[in-house]
């Protein structure tokens, strides 16, 4: 069977074979419930404890700060809704480029009587310092600014932002789902600066889908979204998905190995990609910002992104139009619109997100296929205009 070249690693990553191998016993012979008080249960509990230690070590946190969830979306909801439930309604401040699993719970708070304050970003997808300071002057009780954007790859200076917000004593959260595995994370340093919670997900770094974590300062009071047996420090009830959690721990450990060298390789591949894109007339979004090393978001004027992605798929290349989590939405990306990108470009946005197994030859082949496809689409447009 023909396998397209996979250039969509910000959507999900292939399961690392070493991770799968570590998970298999917990999908077969080690089937105990971690709450059971016999050896099967104790074995499951030991596996979860070891995975928790691995995740904590990978991000510079204490194991007791790691709360396992079903993924990044649940972890983001747990922080925003869970923290808000323990506070009187006030202001929640989020950046204008947050993932929907931050934006939507924030909007839910707005419907429940909270004030929602969106913080502006500039043309390179970076939080505007003056508007952030203005938002902080409004004394929000909750603040959430993502560490790295899933569409453009733009990285925020979360340490500086949290440090500025620190005197306010608001709970500060960062969604690090895209950053984890692509750059080094140090929750202890973030916490000292004023970050109280950080979201992670396993499937973005060679782990399984269905496992994530909220790394959270124990001073933060949260009301659980799921009530029940009091698992995960009472913050996330439900029988643990032992196999997925084990896989998460292994993926987290593996992601930190040779991270800097892998990042340099990905940056070099992206540089070759973007040189070719610019030569073909593409506009790169967020190119002047510090970005994740693997991510490039671009568009051609008046070329529909969904159409381009479909043709590239048929040519053997798997890329994304905007973000995979909202691909059913045909509206222009809220991220690009927040950056001030005109609709004629925003509707054409395509994201290439490279992975460790991608090669320079694949990038060159992609550029060739893209050039052919763009020529065809422009020719068709000329005939129908």
How would you label these PLM feature ranges?
Residues 1-385:
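Pyridoxal 5′-phosphate
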